[in-house]
């Protein structure tokens, strides 16, 4: 199609889109974005349209701003088989102008924690991913155990290789085996103003044996481009509504609330940010997903077989720096649109891995979660249900946050040995009436590849405890530990500084214990102001 110099905006209808919610508009939408990308023009949808996307064979690449103009988009995943490549093909992918590239690594290159220059030069300031093959970190134990991943991190550098002070090198690298360079100067794009409905698969209608397969679907909008903003997107789900109760231990006690996998599948994340700097998701409604389960053995009837949990997410991020999550609300896919506050079967609104400098502000969601580490997180002006689940390091700053349920305000993820090598600040926050612990973790003699720090320093300035009783820490399975520098050494907090801690009335002062495990925390200094 010859656009001509007079064309200032690309419309789907110019390429044959119907927008009636029935006709498959995939080809027209793809052609429109291809033309927009080539011409560097924005895309504008029809306000009253309902665009059905059903026969997508590959992702639709977006590189320019897109205003969906309040239209509805229907992503029909209902017929996608779990073995199909489409299972992890995002409907839209916001791509950079220049793809990431691997560069030659000088033989014998080593890097140290806190090193201020990587010893390499670059064409321009950029983001780089450093990797060390075979040196595993974030080994995981428990139901979903694995052997970890190669040590890696994302940092910002200038053309002379100087490390940006906001992304200091976190680890020691005896051997650097790979460096990947990502552009950070992509022209800003904004994409949004839409209602998007995902029609989820009904897997057992496609494959009767699906129930015993551990697999995730990756569909929705993926962002790989720096300086990208997703805004005003209201996401909903159709077809995920059959809740089941499970007695995993056979003791007559229901200990898992999940979803029947005949009626839906677990998702990696509808919104998925990966390998980008300064990306934002704002002013949007997120869908709370039901947790799922799978049979650990070959068949459900295998003796001793159990179901394991699979979280399902509407938002996920990997290898991102300066990610902002602003003004987000999580809701159920019910007629009432009820906001979720602490329902375990709907816990999975967010997951993340290897991100740095993450901001969550003015959000009403179930949880902030970092699976394989976050370095620097700031959570402010939020109401959270399932909670704050973190491992990693740097600084965790939490201000004006109300945690409405659960037994602990902050959970250090127990499946990664509750490692957080950094400081925690809690300011002007409120804990729900069942909550009696500020920070909870679990420790076993399990080396996840990192030193076992259970936070370094804790500062509390303003905390209302609705339960009326409180302890700063509770670390499960805590036992006398080695004082030598072996991998099983546990590093407990050095210092706690607390002020303005009150009971539910906000007036009666509370003086929390460090922990019920007093002997183990004997070296931790507590300062009450």
Residues covered by each model-derived region:
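Glycine-rich, low-complexity segments
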Residues: 1-9
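Small/polar beta-strand repeat architecture
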Residues: 146-154, 158-207, 212-214
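Short glycine/acidic-rich loop motifs that flank beta-strands on beta-rich extracellular proteins
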Residues: 55-56, 75-80, 200-206, 238-269, ...
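N-terminal extracellular ligand-recognition/capping segment immediately after the signal peptide
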Residues: 26, 33, 38-87, 132-151, ...
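Parallel beta-helix/beta-solenoid
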Residues: 67, 91-113, 119-134, 184-206, ...
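Acidic Gly/Asp/Thr-rich repetitive segments characteristic of extracellular carbohydrate-active
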Residues: 12-46, 112-121
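Surface-exposed loop/turn motifs in large extracellular/passenger domains
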Residues: 60-65, 180-192, 219-235, 254-256, ...
């Amino acid at each position: 199609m010859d656009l001509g110099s007079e064309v200032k905006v690309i419309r789907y209808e110019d390429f044959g889109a119907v927008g009636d919610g029935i006709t498959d508009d995939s080809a027209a939408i793809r052609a429109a974005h291809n033309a927009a990308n080539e011409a560097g023009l924005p895309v504008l949808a029809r306000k009253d349209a309902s665009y059905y996307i059903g026969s997508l064979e590959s992702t639709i690449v977006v590189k320019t701003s897109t205003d969906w103009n309040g239209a509805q988009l229907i992503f029909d995943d209902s017929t996608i088989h779990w073995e199909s490549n489409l299972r992890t093909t995002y409907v839209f992918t916001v791509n950079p102008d220049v793809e990431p590239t691997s560069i030659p690594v000088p033989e014998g290159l080593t890097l140290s924690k806190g090193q201020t220059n990587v010893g390499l030069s670059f064409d321009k300031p950029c983001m780089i991913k450093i990797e060390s093959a075979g040196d595993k970190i974030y080994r995981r134990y428990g139901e979903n155990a694995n052997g970890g991943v190669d040590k890696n991190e994302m940092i910002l550098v200038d053309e002379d290789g100087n490390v940006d002070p906001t992304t200091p090198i976190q680890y020691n690298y005896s051997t650097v085996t790979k460096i990947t360079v990502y552009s950070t100067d992509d022209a800003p794009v904004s994409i949004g103003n839409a209602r998007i409905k995902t029609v989820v698969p009904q897997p057992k209608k496609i494959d009767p044996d699906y129930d015993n397969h551990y697999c995730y679907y990756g569909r929705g909008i993926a962002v790989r481009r720096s300086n990208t903003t997703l805004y005003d997107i209201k996401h909903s789900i159709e077809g995920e509504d059959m809740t089941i109760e499970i007695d995993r231990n056979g003791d007559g006690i229901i200990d898992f609330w999940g979803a029947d996998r005949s009626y839906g599948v677990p998702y990696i994340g509808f919104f998925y940010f990966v390998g980008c700097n300064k990306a934002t998701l704002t002013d949007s409604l997120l869908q709370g997903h039901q947790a799922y389960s799978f049979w650990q053995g070959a068949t459900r009837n295998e003796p001793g077989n159990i179901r394991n949990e699979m979280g399902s997410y509407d938002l996920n991020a990997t290898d991102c720096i300066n990610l902002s999550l602003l003004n987000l609300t999580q809701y159920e896919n019910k007629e009432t649109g009820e906001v979720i506050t602490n329902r375990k079967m709907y816990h999975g609104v967010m997951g993340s891995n290897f991100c740095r400098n993450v901001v969550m502000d003015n959000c009403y969601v179930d949880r902030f979660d970092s699976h394989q580490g976050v370095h620097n997180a700031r959570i402010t002006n939020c109401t959270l249900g399932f909670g704050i689940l973190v491992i990693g390091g740097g600084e965790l700053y939490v201000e004006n946050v109300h945690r409405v349920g659960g037994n602990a305000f902050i959970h250090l993820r127990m499946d990664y040995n509750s490692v957080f090598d950094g400081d925690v600040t809690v300011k002007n926050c409120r804990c729900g009436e069942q909550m009696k612990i500020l920070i909870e973790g679990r420790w076993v003699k399990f080396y996840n590849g990192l030193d076992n720090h259970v936070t370094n320093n804790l500062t509390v300035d303003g905390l209302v405890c609705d339960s009326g009783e409180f302890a700063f820490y509770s670390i499960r399975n805590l036992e006398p530990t080695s004082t030598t520098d072996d991998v099983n050494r546990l590093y407990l907090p050095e210092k706690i500084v607390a002020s303005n801690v009150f009971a539910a009335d906000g007036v009666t002062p509370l003086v929390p214990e460090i922990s019920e495990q007093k002997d183990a925390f004997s070296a931790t200094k507590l300062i009450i102001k």
